[in-house]
Amino acid sequence: MPQSDRVMISKQIIFPTLATLMLLTSCFTGVEGTKKITQKDVDKVVKELTDEEVKANSLAVPVDSFANWQAGKRFYVSDDNAKLIFANSDSYNADTLHLKGRELTYSGYYLGSVLDNRATVNVKFTDGVNTYVYVTDKTVQEIRPDYTIPFLIDMDVVEYINRQLCGKDCYVKTSIWYGEDERMIAGRKYVKVHIDDVKPGNKVFPIKVLFTDVETSRKAMLWMTLGGTVLKNRSFDALFSFSDVRKRYPNITDEVWRCIVEGKTQPGMTKDEVRLSLGTPEHVNQRPTYSGVKEYWYYTDGRYFYFEDGILVK
């Protein structure tokens, strides 16, 4: 067969094959599958914070290493179960001991020994009447600088945070507030508040921040954690901002922003606006269709929201 005929036959074979592949490729519209979106995909901000803004919104609390504790250092007892952590004593009846809400002072430590003959630290506290001993089962070298004792809140830390915050105005970032009776109440988010006081909290959240809504004069409080905890959503950075959050979203209308402040939604809101109002959903399903992208957001309280091309429908 002549060379020119072989080339012609090759072209006739290749061109229909390419055309067929292009036709087959165009048939995959994406309707066949449902894409599962992760929390990382959803949890986006409209405007990323700069390093300076992140630093400005952080609350660095210095660590008072155990090795530096001085006699007289004060601790707030956050729970009556504190009686379970102290060694038995003839000086008091542990069954009837109620220490919650009281302050204990550190009065030093002495070295004991256990079965492996290690010199372990026994920490002493007093309420002015009794001495309470906490057995660490650790040597001096094994005690980390950030060592804490269950149910005891370091009053030096509480007072340090109080000096940093009390009397200042900032912006609250959650609508889950607590009243003076410590019961949950519906609050407002991204509004200016005045910090009135910082007090010791409870066994889960060691810090209690009391504040006043500048616009409504309503008083409330929030529970807060410190660094080194898994409860990141209750840290200072998660609860408060020193800068006006509203200014980071200039394209959001005042009407929509009022919904966000009240933790509400309305049709026509964008996904970012809904996220600002309600937080990140538990999970998201995205379904591409011929008419556009349909997306469903599901929250832990049973609510779900339906978006078309990024706009809330219901």
State each model region's role.
Residues 5-17:
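Bacterial N-terminal signal peptides that target proteins for export
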Residues 24-26:
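C-terminal motif of bacterial Sec signal peptides marking the signal peptidase cleavage site
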Residues 28-71, 93-101, 108-314:
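Residues within mature, well-folded domains
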Residues 74-76:
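Conserved long hydrophobic alpha-helices within structured protein cores
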Residues 86-88:
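A composition-biased, non-transmembrane "mature-region" signal
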